[in-house]
Amino acid sequence: MHSLPVNLVLTVLTVFLTSPAQVIGYRPYPPKTNGSDQIFDASKKFEGSSNLVRLRYHMGPVLTNNITVHPIWYGTWQKSQKKIIREFINSISAVGSKHPSVSGWWKTVQLYTDQTGSNITGTVRLGEEKNDRFYSHGKSLTRLSIQSVIKSAVTSRSRPLPVNPKSGLYLLLTADDVYVQDFCGQVCGFHYFTFPSIVGFTLPYAWVGNSAKLCPGVCAYPFAVPAFIPGLKPVKSPNGDVGVDGMISVIAHEIAELATNPLVNAWYAGPDPVAPVEIADLCEGIYGTGGGGSYTGQMLNDHSGATYNVNGIRRRYLIQWLWSHVVSYCTGPNALD
């Protein structure tokens, strides 16, 4: 594997809307290093650890109530693909999964509190779902038309999704033939909240796209690799679907940040609330001990050679680490330290 210096790149991959609102964006592939990387001490024991990171609480709400995730399946999805994603969501709160587990990964999220000292919930469950198999808003979506898709899901005459502003998360998942504004070039997923002027309610939501046809080397890394890293070989995906296995880490990233910063006024670093650096942004591309730069860190392999770092209920997944504000470093349940 092509090796670059072990460090954390704090170039936050957030994207600005052309409309007045701005949305957090994320892409998992290894960023190109630059001079700012040198502020991090590669000899530190814990990945991404730095006294220079100032993740602060800005007094906004976090999700202390039990979380219900409502997937919206936009476009054509195979049953096998839906099952991979559903089982990941159900694994977040699962007890008894083999170590290292998805639920162990979520414990870092649970460290975060609101202004009363209440921790983020340990209960995340799969809620009602909505299928939009006929591409109701076309195959090319803007950031604002995404909100229109969510509006259609919660106002549908036939089995609308429940409206739950306090503990509901609305997860829009687009099929591999759908293009979303800035997809592949700048983001693989983002989260924000809906505007009452469009949807009728303020609802925390996230979008994640299947990159299998459009840009797997960008959004399904390390199951596919970007062209700017010559000689680097992809690893085998744990569930046999490069696009969906690549989505899992992006979904994990966005759910963790929705829980800790649902209205973009709670936990984040940086001076700008409309372009915050959040708990998953700080650990982008780190999946194991030693991770940073273009190196994912030490991961695990199953008997078939597939790569993963956490166990779910019945499946294995590869998901990025998260920032712990308690100890000021990126951490995950598969850490070797």
Swiss-Prot record:
Keyword annotations of the record: Apoplast, Glycoprotein, Secreted, Signal
Family annotation (InterPro entries): EXORDIUM-like
GO cellular component, one term: apoplast
Pfam family for this entry, one: Phi_1
Residues bearing attached sugar chains per UniProt: 34, 66, 119
Location of this chain's protein in the cell: Secreted; Secreted, Extracellular space; Secreted, Extracellular space, Apoplast
Keyword Glycoprotein included in the entry's annotation: yes
Oxidoreductase among keywords: no
Signal peptide annotation: 1-25
Induction data: By brassinolide.
Function: May play a role in a brassinosteroid-dependent regulation of growth and development.
Membership in a protein family: Belongs to the EXORDIUM family.
Protein name per its UniProtKB record: Protein EXORDIUM-like 3
Organism, as annotated: Arabidopsis thaliana (Mouse-ear cress)
Gene (name only): EXL3
